[in-house]
Amino acid sequence: DMSRVELPMMFNLHHPLNLEVIGPEAQRDNMQSAAYRVIWGFLRKCPASKVRFCIFDPKEGGGSVRMLSNFVNKMPDSYKKAVTQMSRTEELLSCLKELEGQTLDFIRDRPDYDDLLDYNAHNPRRTEAITLLMLYDFPLNADARCLELLSSVMQKGNKCGIYVILCRNTAVEVASSYDHVDEKLAELEKNCVQIECKENGFALLPYHLSVRLIEKPDAGQLEKFAVEYHKAVEKLNVQSIHFEEILPPEPFQGSTAKVLKLPMGIGDGDSVVSMVFGEGTSHHGLIGGGTGGGKSTLLHTLIMSSMMN
């Protein structure tokens, strides 16, 4: 059909990604379906354990993301922490404050990097997860305080890997004692790519171009993917420290008269964990664990690291 042209629709995560899926109450299921596909796209494309979800679902208390809950239930306990579910205004407010602080910390502490993706590219053994903030039945339970913080996160959040998905239920009105809420909402939407839910599919606004989203996985595909994902996460959890990372530039020059840091292994966030000797620290430690738990290996690492430093 020469009268029809299909083009790929892709988002560049180096730029702000704020997606608003709009529809009336009658299209609520379709809006959830669209969000479902976005979640699936992120899980499928992002490295294992490198995407964090913050879900605000005031109407169903997590029921809107049952697919994600079922998926995470198959994951190790450590990965379940990567999904935060909220339903109350104060919970959303607290989450937004945390995300805004996270953004400001990144801008202050890592000025040499364009964004989190740039940081990850230059630090492959220290990669950090991106965050997908999803608000269902928006703007239900989101008062003016939330809208102000949300606007800040949407404008700066991509700097530290935060992306926002809004499921805008047009039947919901903002209930707030604050002034100019409608203006805040309109300003916020200017920073969004908008997709409208219709009975016959999805349309990209303001052009009303038809959009065909990726297909949802069936139960078998999701089960297979969850098993593979689980294996990938477990593999990531078993890491060792490279000798090059603990070798000091000038061996044998350390001194406990000041501060002596002895690299010991890999900790949370793939960061190097060190045992510190010197001013303000304790020179005593207790190593506990069952048979075969690695006590001797840890002592060997401590001895070798001490000798090299």
Short names for language-model regions:
Residues F225-L236:
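Extended, compositionally biased alpha-helical segments that mediate assembly or anchoring
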Residues D1-Y113, Y119-A226, E244-N309:
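P-loop NTPase catalytic phosphate-binding loop
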